[in-house]
């Protein structure tokens, strides 16, 4: 396959590029300081909580629609199936997985790979688009009389019908990885493994059929490209939009920019914006705007990006809180600030003024906004 890299700037000699996508996931909640009516959001928020439940919050009314009790203890991580019909939930020990029917709000199944004194923890989980199997990164911890023996990370295919490991997938070049970012093509026929290079596997026998060689110079003097986590809700299927950073060793500085990845064509469209800062990043549903969250001790800012003209529009200081994450609502007019605790702050996306706060009856461990079906064609 041919490789593409579209850049809207002149590449400096010996420029090292490092890209990481920063994405950044009962009693009725109380809402304080309700402001004037705005365009209604129509998504659904799924919050795993220390109560041992998945709380379902309606964006339009900001009311709790219900709770799904977890059978595996405190849920801490939620992964949606490709068609959004299932939730794959992991517990706080990362030993147990529960599969939940999203529409019926019922548990379908649970499983663990732990046996006896050997604990097997699942550090990465990705379902295939047809919900027939999971790709897992596992590690075994065995308790001896005086110590724990920690086994190597293992990449496996777990069959959901037989509830058994179908195969162990060899690590590229036999080199173990502590984690593996895995993405499937929309039809499920290809699996992309993110790393130093992007390895492309067919999913019948999981043999490598192609690779996106990121270590090759993109043009004379250019360096390599690395991907971090890619947000499945940021773009249409097969595309991923995020904030990238570029390291310039000659000037000893990092430059950030907006990038859009098309995996099928092995293409990155990258647009530099300015000096890099560590930011959380969230794309508005119309993909015309994106927002960054800068946080440092006593310094918190909202950043606004124009995705049509690839530029930074504004930086707005706000009060913030010590631990926080950000997400744009499904209407694109509000920004959620959340993370530790039981509150979600809503900020106006135009003025960045605090509009109101939603207070839940339990502290959250994860936050996932499921956009309405119009965000994902065919759903």
Please place each PLM-identified region on the residue numbering:
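Predominantly soluble domains enriched in secretory-pathway, periplasmic, or organellar proteins
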Residues: 19-379
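Bacterial N-terminal signal peptides that target proteins for export
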Residues: 1-14
